[in-house]
């Protein structure tokens, strides 16, 4: 039995191939659809384990473009000698469940509180997120003692 391809099948196959090529060659998109999605994706890089199992949020330019606004991207991608990972407040981690709550929405800016246990120690950070044309990005992260911007500025190479 011989199956004959119709013009509609040719168009469908052509469309699928074009879409596959477009998605395969597209760089990582910047931003996320919601503040919660951005936070969940940050901490997904820390996994259920420790630095031996997970390297945390990568320091490459593509990841920086996806998670940070332009003013913070270069600092994130270029810092290499920090004494600890600011996003978990420790050089080692075993991150427990992450609690996310919106503190305040202000035009295109949203303040998000993030809390979790890291190896039995309670950690609370406040993310300042901005909404741009590509979605939500991090403009800063504040701990009770420091901010990500100031922290990265201290250790820039």
Please tell me what each predicted stretch does.
Residues 2-16:
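Bacterial N-terminal signal peptides that target proteins for export
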Residues 21-27:
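N-terminal signal peptide c-region/cleavage motif recognized by signal peptidases
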Residues 31-32, 65-121:
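Surface-exposed, charged secondary-structure patches
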Residues 32-37, 58, 119-120, 146:
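Soluble non-cytosolic domains of exported or imported proteins
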Residues 33-51:
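Short, aromatic-enriched amphipathic alpha-helices that serve as compact interaction elements
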Residues 50-60:
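Surface-exposed patches in mature extracellular/periplasmic domains of secreted proteins
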Residues 104-109, 119-122, 140-157:
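Low-complexity, intrinsically disordered terminal/linker segments enriched in charged
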Residues 125-130:
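Hydrophobic/aromatic beta-strand elements that line small-molecule binding cavities or substrate pockets
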């Amino acid at each position: 039995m011989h199956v004959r391809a119709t013009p509609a099948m040719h168009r469908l196959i052509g469309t699928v191939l074009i879409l596959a090529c477009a998605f395969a060659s597209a760089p990582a998109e910047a931003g996320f659809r919601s503040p919660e999605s951005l936070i969940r994706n940050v901490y997904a890089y820390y996994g259920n384990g420790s630095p031996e199992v997970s390297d945390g949020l990568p320091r490459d330019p593509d990841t920086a473009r996806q998670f940070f606004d332009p003013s913070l991207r270069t600092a994130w991608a270029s810092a290499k000698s920090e004494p600890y990972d600011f996003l978990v407040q420790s050089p080692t981690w075993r991150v427990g469940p992450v609690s996310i709550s919106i503190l305040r929405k202000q035009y295109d800016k949203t303040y998000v509180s993030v809390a979790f246990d890291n190896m039995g120690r309670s950690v609370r950070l406040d993310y300042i997120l901005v909404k741009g044309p590509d979605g939500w990005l991090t403009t800063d992260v504040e701990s009770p003692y420091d901010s990500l911007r100031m922290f990265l500025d201290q250790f820039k190479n």
